[in-house]
Swiss-Prot record:
Gene Ontology, cellular component aspect: mitochondrial matrix; mitochondrion
The name this protein goes by in its record: Ferredoxin-2, mitochondrial
Gene that specifies this protein: FDX2
Cofactor(s) required, per the database record: [2Fe-2S] cluster
Gene Ontology biological process: [2Fe-2S] cluster assembly; [4Fe-4S] cluster assembly; electron transport chain; P450-containing electron transport chain; ubiquinone biosynthetic process
Molecular-function GO terms, alphabetical: 2 iron, 2 sulfur cluster binding; electron transfer activity; metal ion binding
Functional summary from the UniProt entry: Electron donor, of the core iron-sulfur cluster (ISC) assembly complex, that acts to reduce the persulfide into sulfide during [2Fe-2S] clusters assembly on the scaffolding protein ISCU. The core iron-sulfur cluster (ISC) assembly complex is involved in the de novo synthesis of a [2Fe-2S] cluster, the first step of the mitochondrial iron-sulfur protein biogenesis. This process is initiated by the cysteine desulfurase complex (NFS1:LYRM4:NDUFAB1) that produces persulfide which is delivered on the scaffold protein ISCU in a FXN-dependent manner.
Annotated Pfam families: Fer2
NADP keyword on record: no
Positions contributing to [2Fe-2S] cluster binding: 105, 111, 114, 151
Family: Belongs to the adrenodoxin/putidaredoxin family.
Free-text cofactor note: Binds 1 [2Fe-2S] cluster.
Signal sequence, renumbered to the chain: none
Transit peptide: 1-52
Length: 183
């Protein structure tokens, strides 16, 4: 019962049997050298990849229901419609579309540079901010009742049509002058 390396690679059981000098075909029987040996341990090898939370794959959403259309309003007042996926956070979505939402702490809840205003119609659809987000929002300039940190807003189907307005200014208390590169 040996497993193969993903995609037709080397059979792990074959390598183990060869190393031990026994060629087990099934439990209770063997081929090969004629020496008695313990059955080889079967291990599975898999090739896996990772996708950081909130990052869109090149192929786009798998199903149309995964798409959430939102609008960003930049500092000049220009409305910029964008499409994201369920599970994306607003900070990474804005950065992927070239919007000026800084995110100096790279979504670690250590700054307020991804501060946005959420449209009133959609604000109540978000879970309330936790204590750490509230602490960071306290340092955000131009704080309003509908202020939230973009890194903490995760897109859901209910946020279809939501507007996220960028405040006129932000303050980077994290590292003076540090501007991270989007992932």
């Amino acid at each position: 019962m040996a497993a193969s390396v993903a995609w037709g690679g080397v059979n792990a059981g074959f390598l183990l049997r060869a190393a031990r000098g026994a060629w087990w075909s099934r439990p209770g029987g063997f081929w090969g050298s004629g020496e008695a040996a313990a059955p080889a341990i079967a291990r599975k090898f898999r090739a896996t990849g990772s996708r950081p939370a909130g990052e869109e794959e090149a192929g786009g959403p798998e199903r149309p229901g995964d798409v959430v259309n939102v609008v960003f309003v930049d500092r000049s007042g220009q409305r910029i419609p964008v499409s994201g996926r369920v599970g994306d956070n607003v900070l990474h979505l804005a950065q992927r579309h070239g919007l000026d939402l800084e995110g100096a702490c790279e979504a670690s809840l250590a700054c307020s540079t991804c501060h946005v205003y959420v449209s009133e119609d959609h604000l109540d659809l978000l879970p309330p901010p936790d204590e750490r987000e509230d602490d960071m929002l306290d340092m955000a300039p131009l704080l309003q009742e509908n202020s939230r940190l973009g890194c903490q807003i995760v897109l859901t189907p209910e946020l279809e049509g939501a507007e996220f307005t960028l405040p006129k200014i932000t303050r980077n208390f994290y590292v003076d002058g540090h501007v991270p590169k989007p992932h």
